[in-house]
């Protein structure tokens, strides 16, 4: 998920705008899971009850399901959810995909062992970022882990989502969370996007209470 659609300088703000992006192929929809999540799954880090927040067309969610997890994927865009359901059916994978708002995850009414975030954190402005963290707190069980991939400040230019610093990540999760790692990573984009693979942060953050 990115903050700006292809060829646009205006941030996406509404559910309708997010949905409109999926009339085509958005630049973050590569048709495969991001490599950092593949490595995490292979290392046994995606197990139990898993939520893929801002799941798009479901690649991270289906990766988790293929590794035996019980998976829910939520996205604000109905077209993305429709595509995700079709892909999961084609691949013979059981994933529950629902239209939902990342700022209101409490509406799911359940908690998860693992929450995956591929490009959601970085779409929020300063006002909505604390709301998103509070929303996450409602669904990550105590001791559970939230894994996120976001653009870093090392990515040049201003195309796409806002850049995030390590200090911003640590500050956002200072209360009620334990930052276990923040590592440089790569965020892959689809062919033809204005940027190639971009510099990113990959973080693992545990819910401490």
Spans of features found by a protein language model:
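A short acidic, Gly/Pro-enriched loop at the edge of an enzyme's catalytic core
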Residues: 107-115
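Class I (Rossmann-like) S-adenosyl-L-methionine-dependent methyltransferase catalytic domain
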Residues: 2-51, 57-108, 124-139, 144-209
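Short catalytic micro-motifs in class I SAM-dependent methyltransferases
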Residues: 119-123
């Amino acid at each position: 998920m990115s903050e700006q659609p292809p060829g646009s300088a205006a941030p996406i703000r509404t559910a309708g705008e997010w949905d409109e992006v999926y009339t085509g192929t958005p630049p973050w929809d590569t048709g495969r899971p991001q490599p950092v999540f593949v490595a995490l799954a292979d290392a046994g880090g995606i197990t139990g009850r898993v939520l893929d927040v801002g799941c798009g067309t479901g690649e991270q969610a289906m990766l988790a399901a293929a590794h035996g997890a019980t998976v829910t994927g939520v996205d604000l865009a109905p077209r993305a959810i429709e595509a995700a359901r079709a892909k999961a059916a084609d691949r013979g994978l059981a994933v529950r995909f629902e239209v939902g708002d990342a700022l209101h995850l409490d509406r799911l009414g359940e908690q998860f062992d693992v929450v995956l975030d591929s490009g959601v954190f970085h779409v929020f402005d300063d006002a909505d970022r604390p709301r998103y963290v509070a929303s996450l707190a409602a669904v990550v069980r105590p001791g559970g882990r939230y894994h996120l991939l976001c653009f870093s400040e090392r990515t040049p230019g201003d195309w796409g989502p806002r850049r995030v610093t390590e200090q911003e990540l640590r500050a956002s999760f200072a209360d009620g969370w334990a930052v276990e790692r923040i590592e440089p990573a790569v965020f892959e984009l689809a062919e033809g996007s204005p940027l190639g693979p971009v510099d990113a942060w990959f973080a693992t953050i545990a819910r401490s209470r």
